[in-house]
Structure formats: C-alpha cells, structure tokens
Amino acid sequence: RTTSSAASDVYKRQVYFDKIKQCLKPGKQATLQIITIQDARWEVYRKSVDFIQKYIFPGGMLPSPSVLRKEVHRAGLSVQHSIEFGKSYSQTLRRWFEVFNNKWDTISAMGFDDRFRRMWNFYLTSCAATFESGNCDVTQITLQKPDNN
C-alpha cells in the first residue's frame, strides 16, 4: 500500500462521516454496522494489501476501533451507543459457508467455477476464524449530530 493510497483511505473516511453529519438533522441519530480490525494490528494492516482487499473488496480498508472513534469525533458527531459481536458473526459466516456449499450445484449451473468456490470457501472460513479469534470485530455504533441548542 502506498502513501497516496493511505491518504486516500483517510480522505474517504472523512468524506463519509462528514456526509453522515450533513444528512442528519440536529439531535438526530444514525446507526452503522462496521467491521473493525484490532488497534494492535492497525499499523501493519494499513500498510499492506491482504487477500480480502485484493480479491473480495478491492480497495477496502477496515478502521480500527480507535480510528473509527477518532473520525466520528473529528466529524463533530458523538457516539451514543456501541455493541460488538464478532464472535457471533463468526457463526454467521460458518452458516453462510454451509449454505454456499449445499447450494453449489445451483451456483455452478450459473457458470461459477471451482476457483470461485475455493476463493469464497477460503474467504468465509478465514473470516470466521478472524472474528472468532478477535482479530476483527463487528460493531454497531449509533452516532448523533449535536443539537443546535
């Protein structure tokens, strides 16, 4: 990952949270669901490109919890509520893996090949392990735009 792409990631996050603030009326809230990467892993992660960034979500960049909160506050929003449920999401990914493979005949009839199957099996199982281990998390966060009073 280059310095310019890292700067682009910061800019995109700033634009995103600024737009949320712009769209909210004073005192109103927005709830987001965001996947985060551990703070301890953030510096290494942001400087590299992993399998998911290359093949599943090209150009994607997960925030860490502290980066997420920093951007929220920079945009002038406040965090009203937050819950994390990565371990539960791991079970969801394992279920998607089962359904995907149980429906493989239907999927392959649409023209998808074994390479596609292996790629998605790797994605689903590696993500399940990542959430189970706590290296990534899923956060639902409720943000509020300040009241004008």
What residue spans do the PLM features occupy?
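Single conserved hydrophobic/aromatic residue that forms the stacking wall/gate
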Residues: 1-7, 11
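Glycine-centered flexibility sites
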Residues: 9, 27-28, 59-60
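Conserved strand-to-helix beginnings and helix N-cap segments that scaffold or border functional pockets
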Residues: 13-14, 93
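A short glycine-rich, Lys/Arg-flanked "PGG" loop and its adjoining helix->strand segment in the class I
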Residues: 14-27
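Conserved beta-strand signature within the Rossmann-like core of class I S-adenosyl-L-methionine
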Residues: 27-35
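Substrate-binding/catalytic lobe of Class I Rossmann-like enzymes that use SAM or dcSAM, i.e.
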Residues: 36-149
